[in-house]
UniProtKB/Swiss-Prot annotation:
GO terms for biological process: carbon fixation. Homodimer. One of its GO terms (molecular function) is magnesium ion binding. This is Ribulose bisphosphate carboxylase-like protein. It comes from Chlorobaculum thiosulfatiphilum. Mg(2+) binds at K198, D200, E201. The keyword Transmembrane helix does not apply. Belongs to the RuBisCO large chain family. Type IV subfamily.
């Protein structure tokens, strides 16, 4: 690529109609001449060849991805990761902002991903280390997406739960219970105060606990719990499956008593999520399997908040994500970023409920609330409810009691003096530390 060719892949914001472009932020490590490497990077993901031989034309003004800003962070002695490459020369770490014309792929998530994090992005000469840090969508692009059907307000209205977090619980043991056993445990947790009892992301439609039988038992238990507590409840059924089975599993689960559905968003694909969101009449909740495999490396892959944003775009009403606990191995800053992506303005797209989770209990509720910075989040203990020494009903009560302490502005230790379920969790934690 000569110097004139390189210029065709650079532009200023002022020279572009930015409503016609997605803006992407990347961390890149470039080998050799930086601007040549960046031009190749834009070319490979858009106009790899911008004219026909012997024809006086240039498709770059309309169709090329273009660098609109870049900053050289530092010169490196070697690449951050031993990625195989053939280029030679100095290595520079760069922050790069690229405008990509969305007419190249339209409002279609598979085509969008192919352009911004596909072959062209990760196989560009001179750019062996790549991390997609963010995507910014213009309102004209967002207008073609439906987004969450219910969102935060819709879910709160279903549950009549306002001014506080939404309390989920992952029924445990997560694998191995019969539908009858599973439903009894969920029922007890609803009586104790959970809003939503959910299948684990690994429990879907299996021979020993079919979605049909499990949903029937849980639907009956849910209605019984609603009658006894006077509170709406949700059974969240996992319908993750092959794409050609999703509609059938949806119908079976809802017909038999599930009133919200769990989907492992990346394993089934965001296009499948969008299809389900457009079809369903119950809230759709996403879980995070597969994302860490390409988001955890600091300088390579895709930053997790990009996937959170895309899950919201695809129509998830709730996004479950790695939370603040040490077990989740996620920096606090990254968790907060993901929470913000669920709720910040996004054109016509409704906010979705963020659920940062991982090894939570009544003892961590206050910490999660303070770090999230609002009540618009879901709290999703597993063993913190179902491993409670007094049983799942008491485990759920301990969560509600911890929230009462927060509302009263007093410590959970003080509140626990008159609330034995909360005291039992404190005592159990103290024993584990011995």
């Amino acid at each position: 690529m000569n110097a004139e060719d390189v210029k065709g892949f650079f532009a200023s914001r002022e020279s572009l109609d930015m409503e016609q472009y997605l803006v992407r932020d990347y961390y890149l490590e470039c080998v050799g001449d930086i601007e040549t490497a960046l031009a190749h990077f834009c070319s490979e993901q858009s106009t790899a060849q911008w004219k026909r031989v012997g024809v006086d034309e240039d498709f770059r003004p309309m169709h090329a991805a273009k660098v609109i800003d870049y900053d050289v962070i530092e010169e490196l002695e070697q690449l951050s990761y031993p990625v195989k490459h053939s280029e030679t020369g100095k290595i520079h770490a760069c922050r790069v902002t690229i405008a990509h014309p969305h007419c190249n792929f339209g409002p279609k998530i598979p085509n969008l991903l192919t352009a911004v994090c596909g072959e062209g992005t990760y196989f560009t000469p001179g750019v062996p280390v790549v991390k997609l840090m963010d995507i910014h969508f213009p309102d004209i692009y967002l207008a073609d997406f439906e987004g969450p059907k219910f969102g935060i307000d819709g879910l709160r209205n279903i549950l009549n739960a306002h001014g506080r977090p939404i309390f989920f619980g992952v029924v445990k043991p997560n694998i191995g219970l019969s539908p009858e056993e599973f439903s009894e445990i969920a029922y007890q947790s609803w009586l104790g105060g959970l809003d939503i009892a959910k299948d684990d992301e690994m429990l879907a439609d299996v021979t020993w606990s079919s979605i049909e039988e499990r949903a029937a038992h849980l639907g009956k238990a849910r209605r019984k719990a609603e009658a006894e507590t006077g509170e709406p409840k949700i059974y969240l059924a996992n319908i993750t499956d092959e794409v050609d089975s999703l509609m059938e599993k949806h119908d079976i689960a809802v017909r038999n008593g599930a009133n919200a559905l769990l989907i492992n968003a990346l394993p089934v694909g965001l296009s499948a999520v969008r299809m389900l969101s457009n079809y369903t009449q119950v809230p759709l909740i996403g879980h995070f399997p597969f994302i860490a495999s390409f988001s955890r490396m600091e300088k390579y892959g895709i930053r997790s908040k990009v996937m959170t944003k895309l899950q919201r775009l695809a129509g998830l009403d709730v996004v479950i994500m790695p939370g603040f606990g040490d077990r989740m191995m996620t920096p606090e800053e990254e968790v907060v970023e993901n929470v913000i992506e669920c709720t910040k303005p996004m054109g016509r797209i409704k906010p979705c409920l963020p659920v940062p989770g991982g090894s939570d209990s009544a003892l961590t509720l206050g910490t999660v609330w303070r770090k999230v910075g609002s009540v618009d989040f879901g709290f999703v203990p597993g063993r913190g409810v179902f491993g409670h020494p007094m049983g799942p009903r008491a485990g759920a009560k301990s969560i509600r009691q911890a929230w009462e302490a927060i509302e009263q502005g007093i410590s959970i230790e003080t509140w626990a003096e008159t609330h034995p379920e909360l005291q039992a969790m404190i005592d159990q934690s103290a024993l584990k530390k011995q």
